[in-house]
């Protein structure tokens, strides 16, 4: 009996039904290493392999969106799903419904691979880090809206500086949708003009739980942000890709608030010191200007007509006084000379002998008669005494023998 010839689609359909109805193949867990990874609009396509065999796999978007980490070539994973036939090319493949990392090692592998890639691109370069503003007015906190993280940040911020405005941007911080929500928050914030700094925060957790902060898309959103970003993910010992890309890494969310929010007491102290310094500078400048003003005032006064007139008046007064003193000195000197000469003249005067009892005889012409030969009898003469004069007539003239 000759076998009936089946068409390709018939045998393929038969094999597919056998696989779909197989109780084992309908729900399998397969462990292997990812290779030939490709992201497509319809889902994620990759090959799962070990040392001997390989298995094509596909994870459609309805399941792919539930992934809480990014797949990487070389990553060891455990894929859960069903084995079926892809009729178009007649190959069987694993239709994945969930993917788990095969231990922490797989996630560390993906972490280090992405870290190396981004580092080569320069996303971690220190010279590209933006400075964190010293006195921010408004801080955006991208984190879960509930839990200890946001409470601690708000409490510390209000304690340090109640004037700083805190804007909470709620996002998922774990799970497959977390990375997209974080990136969307960054896009929204970067359209605003009132945000001074962004804090990206979440509490501690396992590597799987904090994996969204190791996603490449999150790293690139942080790097592209024009607003400075502080990464505060997990505990002090936790490091994420976000920490390396951010402008500043804080060891904890609470530490981020301590770093970003300025202490108002320090600000008040700085303000007091600045006020004191300003007052000192103003006082010094005022004194300098006052001295300058006094100098200009004096110069103006010295060059004014009134001052010049006053100076000339003082000069005239000084010259007058000097001339008076000089004339007085000359007068005194001449008077003394006159008195001395008068005394000398007086001592030599013929009239001086009258005080000693002598007399002076004058003729009619008031000439002194010094000899009897100058007179004759009956001449009229005048006799001068110290206290008066007398007239007489000569009775007799006789010469000495």
Curated annotation (Swiss-Prot):
A single MF term (Gene Ontology): exodeoxyribonuclease VII activity
The protein's assembly and partners: Heterooligomer composed of large and small subunits.
Function: Bidirectionally degrades single-stranded DNA into large acid-insoluble oligonucleotides, which are then degraded further into small acid-soluble oligonucleotides.
Reactions performed catalytically: Exonucleolytic cleavage in either 5'- to 3'- or 3'- to 5'-direction to yield nucleoside 5'-phosphates
GO biological process, alphabetically ordered: DNA catabolic process
Keyword Nuclease: yes
Protein's cellular compartments: Cytoplasm
NCBIfam families in alphabetical order: xseA (TIGR00237)
Organism phylogeny: Bacteria, Bacillati, Bacillota, Clostridia, Thermoanaerobacterales
InterPro entries the UniProt entry points to: Exonuc_VII_L (IPR003753), Exonuc_VII_lsu_C (IPR020579), NA-bd_OB-fold (IPR012340), OB-fold_nuc-bd_dom (IPR025824)
UniProt similarity note: Belongs to the XseA family.
Protein name: Exodeoxyribonuclease 7 large subunit
One Pfam family of this chain: tRNA_anti_2
Sorted UniProt keywords: Cytoplasm, Exonuclease, Hydrolase, Nuclease
Organism of derivation: Thermoanaerobacter sp. (strain X514)
GO CC, alphabetical: cytoplasm; exodeoxyribonuclease VII complex
Predominant localisation class: cytoplasm
Enzyme Commission (EC) number: 3.1.11.6
């Amino acid at each position: 009996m000759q076998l009936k010839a089946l068409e390709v689609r018939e045998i393929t359909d038969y094999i597919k039904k056998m696989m779909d109805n197989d109780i084992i193949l309908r729900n399998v867990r397969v462990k292997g290493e990812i290779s030939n990874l490709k992201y497509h609009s319809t889902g994620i396509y990759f090959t799962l392999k070990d040392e001997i065999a390989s298995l094509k796999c596909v994870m459609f978007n309805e399941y792919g969106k539930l992934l809480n980490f990014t797949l990487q070539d070389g990553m060891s994973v455990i894929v859960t799903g069903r084995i079926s036939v892809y009729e178009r090319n007649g190959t069987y493949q694993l239709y994945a419904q969930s993917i788990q990392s095969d231990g922490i090692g797989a996630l560390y592998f993906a972490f280090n691979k992405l870290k190396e890639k981004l580092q080569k691109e320069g996303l971690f370069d220190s010279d590209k880090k933006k400075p964190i503003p010293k006195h921010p007015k408004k801080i955006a906190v991208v984190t879960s809206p509930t839990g200890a993280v946001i409470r601690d940040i708000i409490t510390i911020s209000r304690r340090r500086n109640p004037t700083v405005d805190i804007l909470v941007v709620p996002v998922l911080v774990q799970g497959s949708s977390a990375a997209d929500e974080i990136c969307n928050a960054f896009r929204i914030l970067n359209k605003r003009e009132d945000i001074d700094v962004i804090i990206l925060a979440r509490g501690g957790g396992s590597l799987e739980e904090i994996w969204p902060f190791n996603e490449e898309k999150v790293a690139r959103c942080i790097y592209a942000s024009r607003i400075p970003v502080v990464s505060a993910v997990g505990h002090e010992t936790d490091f994420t890709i976000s920490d390396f890309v951010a402008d500043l890494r804080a060891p904890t969310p609470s530490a981020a608030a301590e770093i970003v929010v300025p202490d108002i007491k320090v600000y008040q102290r700085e303000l007091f010191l600045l006020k004191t310094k300003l007052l000192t500078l103003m006082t010094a400048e005022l004194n300098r200007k006052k001295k300058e003003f006094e100098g200009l005032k004096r110069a103006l006064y010295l060059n004014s007509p009134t001052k010049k007139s006053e100076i000339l008046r003082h000069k005239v007064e000084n010259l007058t006084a000097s001339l008076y003193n000089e004339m007085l000195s000359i007068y005194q000197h001449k008077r003394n000379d006159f008195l001395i000469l008068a005394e000398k003249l007086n001592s030599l005067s013929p009239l001086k002998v009258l005080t000693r009892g002598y007399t002076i005889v004058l003729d009619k012409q008031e000439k002194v008669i010094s000899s009897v030969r100058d007179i004759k009898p009956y001449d009229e003469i005048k006799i001068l005494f110290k206290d008066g004069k007398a007239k007489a007539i000569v009775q007799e003239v006789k010469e000495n023998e």
